[in-house]
A protein has these predicted regions:
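Acidic/polar-rich alpha-helix caps and helix-coil junctions
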Residues: 1-39, 52, 56-228
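Aromatic (Trp/Tyr) and acidic
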Residues: 44, 48
Length: 228
């Protein structure tokens, strides 16, 4: 099991892993290779995302603030990113998968125990959650149901929140939204409102492919969007 072979790390060892721009560090299992051209793109992307503040919703998840090692490691006081983009697999992701799996298999106490262990590796002087002290479900969060369609419980939201905090800039957020209810999200750009509808979490088939093969059926929702 990845978590056993690559146990969770913390403190300076964790900082070294998160700030490393290349190579396998800490409990990384896989990391994308870097070529000269991809290195230039990496630097460009890291520079570009520093111009846009992080979501206030995301920053709000760090309730312990400075006690959480990620609070200063991932972004600064202006909510601008300071974390390196990472594409690969870390043992932390498997730990998060394990606690969510335990939850869905009915082992709520085991899931809580793993959640507390995970948070103890990220938050100094951590006080463990109990079922009674878990934060209430935040009705303002986008994700309102878990992957089974059931309404979020305090424990499941705590697990998903920890996943969101830990895997920031690791290509995880879109897929979390997709597998947990596909919530409609809107934003405003240049005075116009844009909404991500549920069907948009699955991309459309290219029109050229549909013309070549009349047997293909366009994914739901896109017939009106593309052709009307």
């Amino acid at each position: 099991m990845a978590v056993a072979a690559y146990p969770l790390i913390q403190g300076e060892e964790y900082k070294k892993m998160i700030t490393a721009e290349d190579g396998l560090q800490g409990n990384m299992l896989v990391r994308s290779d870097r070529t000269p051209s991809s290195s230039n793109m990496f630097k460009y992307l890291n520079t570009s995302i520093q111009r846009c503040p992080l979501s206030a919703r995301y920053v709000k998840l760090f309730a312990e603030k400075d006690s959480d090692i990620r609070y200063k490691l991932f972004f600064n006081k202006r909510r601008l990113n300071t974390k390196c983009i990472f594409t690969g697999l870390r043992s932390a992701e498997f730990a998060l998968i394990s606690m969510e799996s335990a939850y869905h298999l009915g082992d709520k106490e085991g899931a809580l125990r793993m959640l507390n262990d995970f948070r103890a590796h990220r938050i100094s002087s951590y006080t463990a959650y109990t079922m009674a002290t878990l934060p209430a479900v935040d009705a303002n969060e986008y994700i309102k149901t878990d992957c089974t369609g059931a309404a979020l419980t305090p424990l499941m939201q705590a697990i998903l929140n920890e996943r969101r905090k830990e895997l920031y800039l690791e290509g995880d957020r879109f897929f979390e939204l997709k597998r947990n209810g596909r919530p409609a999200i809107w934003s405003v750009y240049q005075g116009l409102k844009y909404t991500t509808e549920k069907f948009m979490y699955t991309f459309p088939l290219p029109p050229a492919d549909l013309q070549v093969n009349p047997g293909l059926i366009q994914n739901p929702g896109y017939t009106e969007v593309i052709y009307n």
